[in-house]
A protein has these predicted regions:
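P-loop (Walker A) phosphate-binding loop of NTP-binding proteins
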Residues: 105, 139, 207
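Walker A/P-loop
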Residues: 94-131
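Canonical AAA+ ATPase core
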Residues: 146-151, 172-176, 184-267, 272-282, ...
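Pre-Walker A (pre-P-loop) alpha-helix and adjacent loop at the N terminus of AAA/AAA+ ATPase modules
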Residues: 61-105
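Walker B catalytic acidic pair
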Residues: 104, 167-168, 179
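C-terminal engagement/docking regions of AAA+ P-loop ATPases
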Residues: 3, 24, 35-59, 63, ...
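AAA+/P-loop NTPase substrate/partner-engagement loops
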Residues: 120-148
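Conserved alpha-helical scaffold flanking the Walker A/P-loop in AAA+ ATPase domains
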Residues: 89-92, 145-165
């Protein structure tokens, strides 16, 4: 694998902007990699009726998921002006059954995005303000002695909800940050030897300030790896900021306390839980899975990388690609889905060497290079 010297990160760069990422021979076209009739589970089971949950996703179901997801995105953007791509990432991460990390400076709408997502889903939500004195039991729950019954009773923590907003997660100690690990990966919490399952769906939307800011701790690698995707908000464009100022400083409807109260539920948690299960049925061909493995291997063996994409990162990329395909109304994954999702899914997991960082290179530069030099098939 050739390794050209990395150049400084360009925030406007996109994997699809590099011609090398789409240059493949005609015989190895997307149809060979993506079409569900090529080696699909359904064709290999001819004559054997499989359970409904094992069947490939029907086109009608995919269209329904796409329409409902778009309605949620549009509802979020009624408050988060000018950021449809960020709202889309948030909904996509939910459909992929993952968790979202939003890293940016204070005051750009990270918390508002999480609140709008929960409101548009009609989901229960809890918010934890992470501070240095926050304890793990505040997150997961604890056993409390009940004097009336002379027994210990479990008092659930904030994770017992459907959308958990972990606000400024990197202001708490690493011990408290790690309290979320089991909940994020296993969808359960173990306290005093007893395991308690979490709700469906369950999604953590964590906000984090840049680590250079005062009073922040770096998120442990194990926790960063459990976030399916990472995104940033950025400053709004001028026109969107004007509309935001008008909405947030003008009168509110009677009964509303803040602007997020105007967000309407466009779906239900039960429907989204079913959509999450349906997305897992989107077809990804063996050649496409091999392409993802080659991409992961390229990051692991790159001389300017100290920590490449983990097997969990590869799993998350395939799940995100499936959700991306479904939001486009398709029932199978194409290479373009993988390329579209590799940045938000892998960028926050990679560690570059000090030499690469000293030249101003970033993880996005490395992923651009990997996409250019890794053949699709």
């Amino acid at each position: 694998l050739p390794h050209a010297e990395l150049q400084p990160d360009h925030p406007d760069s996109h994997p699809d902007s590099h011609p090398g990422t789409t240059s493949v021979p005609h015989r190895d076209s997307r149809a060979d990699l993506a079409h569900p009739m090529v080696g699909s589970p359904k064709s290999s089971r001819a004559g054997h009726a499989a359970p409904a949950s094992d069947e490939p996703l029907a086109e009608r179901a995919a269209q329904r998921i796409a329409e409902e997801s778009q309605a949620v995105v549009e509802e979020i953007t009624t408050v988060i002006e000018g950021k449809p791509e960020v709202a889309r990432i948030a909904v996509l991460v939910l459909l992929a059954g993952g968790h979202l990390l939003i890293e940016d400076i204070p005051g750009v709408g990270k918390t508002m995005l999480a609140k709008c997502l929960a409101a548009a889903l009609g989901a229960r939500q809890h918010r934890i303000q992470f501070t240095p004195d926050l304890l793990p039991g505040d997150v997961t729950g604890a056993s409390v002695f009940n004097q009336a019954t002379s027994e210990f009773e479990f008092r659930p923590g904030a994770v017992f909800t459907q959308v958990l907003l972990a606000d400024e997660i990197n202001r708490a100690s690493p011990k408290t940050q790690s309290a979320l690990l089991e909940a994020m990966e296993e969808r359960q919490v173990t306290v005093d030897g007893t395991t308690y399952p979490l709700s469906e769906p369950f999604m953590v939307v964590a906000t984090a300030n840049p680590v250079e800011m005062e009073g922040t701790y770096r998120l442990p690698e194990a926790q960063r790896d459990r976030f399916l995707a990472q995104t940033t908000m950025g400053y709004p464009i001028a026109g969107a900021e004007v509309r935001m100022l008008d909405a947030q400083t003008g009168p509110v409807r009677e009964g509303d306390r803040e602007v997020v109260d105007s967000v309407r539920a466009r779906t239900t948690p039960e429907a989204m839980a079913q959509h999450i299960r349906d997305v897992r049925r989107v077809y990804a061909s063996p050649p496409l899975l091999e392409y993802v493995v080659r991409l992961a291997e390229a990051t692991r063996t790159h001389p300017q990388v100290t920590l490449g994409a983990s097997p969990r990162a590869a799993v998350h990329l395939v799940r995100a690609a499936k959700a991306h395909a479904t939001m486009d109304g398709r029932t199978f994954v194409e290479p373009q889905d993988v390329r579209a999702m590799i940045m938000p899914v892998w960028r926050h997991r990679l560690h570059l060497t000090p030499q690469a960082l000293s030249r101003g290179a970033g993880a996005g530069d490395l992923l651009d290079q990997v996409l250019r030099t890794t053949p699709v098939s």
